[in-house]
Amino acid sequence: MAKKGMVEREKKRQRLVAKYAHKRQALLEQISQASSQQERMDLHRQLQRLPRNSAPTRLRNRCWVTGRSRGYYRDFGLSRHVLREMAHEGLLPGVTKSSW
């Protein structure tokens, strides 16, 4: 299980990304449509002034049960360990053991 601080830090990043998403998108569109190099540099500086953790690339997928970041399955939002346990217990609808 991941440390609580890591999970909370990730939640904080998600809140910041959501908060600044519209402003960041608007600045990126303005940068792409800027006519002069000076205008583009000014807009880029404004983009750099936004909080670092508000960039979506800083997010890391984490299991919603354990907080584990590795072995993450997007379809379920779970790590491989929890996915296996829940599948064996029949808690995931549509997931069955393979047989061939």
Swiss-Prot record:
GO biological process, one term: translation
Alphabetically ordered keywords of this record: Ribonucleoprotein, Ribosomal protein, RNA-binding, rRNA-binding
One GO location term (cellular component): small ribosomal subunit
Gene Ontology MF terms in the entry: rRNA binding; structural constituent of ribosome
Family under the similarity heading: Belongs to the universal ribosomal protein uS14 family.
Primary role: Binds 16S rRNA, required for the assembly of 30S particles and may also be responsible for determining the conformation of the 16S rRNA at the A site.
HAMAP family assigned to the protein according to its UniProt record, in alphabetical order: Ribosomal_uS14_1 (MF_00537)
Oligomer status and interactors: Part of the 30S ribosomal subunit. Contacts proteins S3 and S10.
Name the UniProt record assigns to this protein: Small ribosomal subunit protein uS14
Gene source species: Acaryochloris marina (strain MBIC 11017)
Lineage: Bacteria, Bacillati, Cyanobacteriota, Cyanophyceae, Acaryochloridales
